[in-house]
């Protein structure tokens, strides 16, 4: 009797979509191709949302009785972008096989911007460029147009938003180091948001990249049965192409991005939200940034706890975040791990002042390999303007240290992610510690609530490992995973050695002896 075949696990549709889109990329650089693909996904989203409302207006039933389907105000009233005829997806799909399709898409983007001022200078107009083959562009339009998006709701916000987010992550992986400039790994964003719990109030990210922190904040509110309208977002980004991605990413989610600003001077030199006092600050600023114009800001009023060094912006970012917190506000952000110990150019003194002012609430040591753009070890800082209450227990004179270096799992030899269980474990530890009736306990090797006196004893060093100690079971690690990782790294080094030797030999052969 023949054995029954095991059912083949179907590949997630976003995976299939990515592979198909990647095949059409040909020789186009990932950094350029992302704007081509994401722009089309956005166009499909707004066209679908427009057509859905237009069909209701055409039917003219109930609340839509007597409505004019060509009246832009009808769409504006329902937070739907007006899409002129030449920009509707049906028009693009009908012209997808023509050699002029690139020009047609660019004209569609222009037309949408003209009719929707909030999208001015946001959409990519790159489709008529010579390096984009019209046949491949037509194939991409067919691919995106033929996705089975289900019912209206999932088609617009959920599915297309998910595809957009998934593609952002895949493009970040494809770009490697540069990808990290516009994308924070999803599991890191989820951890920050889960720990901060932004149920209600103003959420601010002064280096917002493609807007992932905002998207996750809105998801958090929805998942906890809150009202999305209870939070408002404020952001700033200095890279215009990244800002455009953020505006599209947020629009697909139906999130108001009117307060997400761009200027090329950046948050330090040209603060777009000078008077903002936020309930939550959530951010992933550039690690150890030496090019932040610190020499022009020596006397800046934000440096209440000490003037940051010109060669490293870490402590400038910390004080910028604090400046924008309201008296009950909480900040959570990613920094290079060196920020926990550095004493260079007065950084140790600033850290001491922050600790003595009772602002540092919790420090989390992150696992290696979470970030695409750097191998620099990273950590999370959580700072609170009011540790005496702020809706929680009085935590004055205490700091929680969490060492999460052993959490997470490898998805390939270079990248790790935190699972939902990892995120919940870390977030729950913080919540139990700060809540009035939280059942918090120190766990050797993982977490410790340290007194201010203990931090003073250790000279204001904030490395969690110094406080949590070693776990009782030191040999409890996955040998196979550790061995595989080391083997892969060794093989990479051998390949690099071979490449460099060949390069040296090639250059030596070019040298002509006189």
How should these model regions be labeled?
Residues 16, 23, 32-33, 37-45, ...:
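Conserved Class I SAM-dependent methyltransferase catalytic core
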Residues 208, 237, 264, 285, ...:
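Active-site proximal loops enriched in glycine and acidic residues that flank catalytic Cys/His/Asp
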């Amino acid at each position: 009797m023949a054995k029954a075949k095991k059912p083949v696990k179907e590949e997630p549709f976003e995976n299939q979509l990515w592979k198909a889109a990647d095949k059409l990329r040909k020789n186009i650089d990932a950094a350029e191709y992302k704007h081509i693909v994401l722009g089309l996904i956005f166009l499909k989203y707004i066209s679908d949302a427009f057509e859905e409302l237009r069909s209701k207006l055409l039917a003219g039933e109930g609340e839509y009785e007597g409505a004019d389907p060509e009246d832009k105000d009808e769409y504006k009233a329902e937070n739907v972008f007006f899409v002129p005829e030449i920009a509707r997806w049906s028009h693009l799909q009908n012209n997808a096989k023509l050699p002029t399709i690139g020009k047609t898409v660019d004209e569609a983007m222009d037309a949408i911007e003209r009719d929707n001022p909030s999208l001015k200078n946001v959409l990519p107009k790159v489709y008529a460029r010579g390096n984009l083959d019209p046949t491949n562009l037509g194939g991409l339009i067919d691919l995106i147009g033929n996705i089975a998006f289900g019912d209206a709701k999932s088609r617009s916000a959920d599915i297309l938003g998910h595809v957009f987010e998934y593609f952002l992550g895949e493009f970040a992986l494809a770009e490697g180091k540069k990808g990290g400039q516009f994308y924070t790994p999803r599991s890191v964003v989820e951890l920050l948001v889960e720990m901060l719990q932004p149920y209600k109030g103003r959420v601010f990210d002064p280096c917002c990249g493609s807007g992932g922190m905002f998207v996750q904040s809105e998801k958090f509110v929805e998942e906890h049965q809150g009202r999305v309208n209870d939070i408002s977002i404020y952001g700033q980004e200095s890279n215009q192409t990244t800002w455009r991605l953020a505006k599209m990413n947020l629009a697909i989610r139906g999130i108001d991005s009117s307060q997400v600003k761009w200027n090329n001077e950046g948050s330090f030199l040209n603060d777009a939200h000078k008077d903002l006092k936020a309930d939550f600050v959530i951010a992933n600023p550039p690690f150890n940034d030496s090019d932040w114009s610190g020499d022009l800001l020596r006397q800046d009023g934000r440096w209440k706890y000490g003037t940051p060094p010109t060669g490293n912006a870490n402590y400038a970012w910390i004080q910028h975040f604090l400046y924008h917190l309201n008296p009950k506000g909480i900040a959570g952000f990613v920094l290079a791990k060196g920020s926990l110990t550095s004493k260079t150019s007065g950084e140790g003194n600033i850290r001491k002042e922050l600790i003595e002012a009772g602002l540092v609430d919790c420090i989390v040591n992150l696992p290696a390999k979470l970030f695409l753009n750097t191998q620099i070890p990273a950590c999370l800082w959580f700072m609170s303007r009011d540790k005496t209450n702020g809706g929680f227990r009085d935590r004055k004179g205490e700091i929680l240290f969490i060492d999460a270096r052993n959490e997470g799992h490898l998805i390939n030899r270079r990248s790790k992610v935190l699972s939902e269980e990892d995120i919940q474990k870390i977030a729950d530890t913080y919540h139990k510690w700060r809540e009035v009736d939280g059942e918090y306990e120190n766990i050797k090797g993982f977490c410790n609530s340290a007194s201010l006196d203990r931090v003073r004893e250790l000279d204001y060093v904030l490395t969690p490992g110094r406080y949590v100690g070693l776990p009782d079971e030191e040999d409890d690690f996955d040998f196979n995973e550790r061995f595989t990782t080391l083997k892969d790294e060794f093989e990479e080094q051998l390949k690099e050695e071979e490449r460099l030797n060949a390069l040296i030999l090639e250059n030596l052969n070019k040298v002509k002896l006189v």
